[in-house]
Amino acid sequence: MASWTQPIETGDIPESGTSFDAIVVGGGPGGSSAAGYLAMAGKRVLLIEKGVWPRDKVCGDAVGGKSLSHVKALGVKETLEQTPHFRVNGILFSSPNGKEVRVPLPEEDVARLEAGYSLPREQFDHLLFDRVQHLVRENGGSVLQLSLIHI
């Protein structure tokens, strides 16, 4: 069974009164990335996600461009390379009347594996969230799943 179909264990609920340098609400790519960078900077983070991993979300299922530098910086690229994926080497635009325009990505980016990847959102989110929850917990933070915030 693929690892991204298995639940992610995120540890215990922090004790009442525990203080954090930052609280990040939302464990999707944006929230996970923010929590990961804060943890790598030595901050004590509380990451709160309303769902439970794994979960799927409607998406274009591609990671590329400037986001690849973050995938690499957060330590996810190597793991992504070891899971099923497609490499993106261009973009195809099509219209309802059947006309198509193909735009190749720069050959040097494709050759360096920096052009992009296509993989299910569930798989990418799982890889990122799992990596970040380790970073957060290793730096004294906590991660909560199935938690709603009411303000």
Where are these regions (language model features)?
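A conserved beta-strand/loop element that lines the FAD pocket in flavoprotein oxidoreductases
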Residues: 134-147
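Extreme N-terminal leader/targeting segments of oxidoreductases
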Residues: 1-22, 37-41
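Glycine-rich FAD pyrophosphate-binding loop
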Residues: 39-59
